[in-house]
Amino acid sequence: MSEMAKKIRVTETALRDAHQSLIATRMTTEEMLPILDKLDKIGYYSLECWGGATYDACLRFLNEDPWARLRTIREHCPNTKLQMLFRGQNMLGYRHYADDCVEYLVQRSVANGIDIIRIFDALNDIKNLKTAINAAKRENGKAEAQVAISYTTGPVFTDEYYVEYAKRIADAGADSICIKDMAALLTPTATESLVKAIKSAVDLPIQLHTHYTSGLASMCLLKGVEAGADGIDTAISPLALGTSHAPTESMVAAFAGTPYDTGLDIKQLAEIRAYFMTLREKYFKNGLLDQKMLATDAKALIYQVPGGMLSNLLSQLKQAGKEDKLTEVLEEVPRVRKDAGYPPLVTPTSQIVGTQAVFNVITGERYKMCTNEFKGLVAGEYGTTPMPIDPAFQKKICGDKKIICLLYTSPSPRDRSVSR
């Protein structure tokens, strides 16, 4: 290995985002238990295993205690960092919560075994991140505050935009930064450019997270690492591809013997693969895993719809007996997103924009019916949108509803002033 060699950190997503992306977060703690001890011996930088939709799914669908799950994983994985996804001021929910709730959830998450808290805001609004970051920092080094940039494309979303946001993240006290490409919109060239730009501006480790929906994830991870990324998110191969992530084994093999060698053992990973392959077959048989979720769909680059959002849209249309309208809805999503100030499509904005697009199509008239959540998004209840919303549109949607945020008028995050 050369003098410039650096071991690339690998975060395994099999226990959280992989199954959230493929089977709607339905993997049970009982299904995880038999493989936990072996996962702990692989040498992963971290195991993403909690937060995101897991809390909701445990309570709503699996009849499980999410805290008991976390403690169980901690007990069986004493040597590997455990990681969670935290929605900033939305915590693990779908609306804003009070600061003391955010602080307490961070504290209890760390107390129950979390080492890395990946914090993001759907609008890339730094104000919605500061409480969670500060709470993590108060844990006296017990938790890494990793802040995620919600990546998307659109008129305002240039490398300069993301660099300025990364600087604000660093100023807020983050320990590391994650480029979170939830909708698989990154291309290899864009990844290389963005990683280089952020690394040149901010002295923090960079983790790269992208999905396989558009078929570009492996190439993006390769170019990102070559450009200076310090870590990557992957999924063990039976739970990889499609709306999930690049396969762990493939990326380990790609970097083996290079200056970016991960240090992970392919033979050990084969044992992990064998176990999850049995679960994969089980999910096919019981209908949890649909073959469509494993397909590559380059239309993701056009419609900018994350995989989980796609399955949710189809479900809504089926319930309305309008599944033949899926293409129209997918075409409507970017238009709704533009009207709403170009929010990145990630929880909760993906659900809000997607549901409104469904309403616009099935009613036959745009914005004839609006959800309360969409009204709240346009009114600023979720934070400041990346681009200004037309005041006339705001009035049409919100009526007499109080506008909470004065929307930004400059594309540079550092130049924007906000009144609440």
Q: What is each residue range found by the language model?
A:
Residues 62-67, 122-139, 156-159, 184-198, ...:
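Active-site-adjacent beta->alpha loops and helix N-cap segments on the catalytic face
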Residues 54-131, 150-162:
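Active-site beta->alpha loop and helix N-cap motifs at the rims of alpha/beta catalytic domains
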Residues 408-415:
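Conserved small/polar residues in nucleotide/adenosyl-binding loops
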Residues 164, 216-227:
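Catalytic cores of alpha/beta
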Residues 18, 119, 177, 228:
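Conserved, mostly hydrophobic/aromatic
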Residues 60-84, 133-147, 192-208, 257-258:
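Alpha-helix-loop-beta-strand connector modules within alpha/beta enzyme cores
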Residues 10-13, 47-49, 82-86, 117, ...:
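Hydrophobic faces of well-ordered beta-strands that scaffold small-molecule active sites
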Residues 3-25, 78-94, 141-153:
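N-terminal small/glycine-rich loop or linker at the start of catalytic domains
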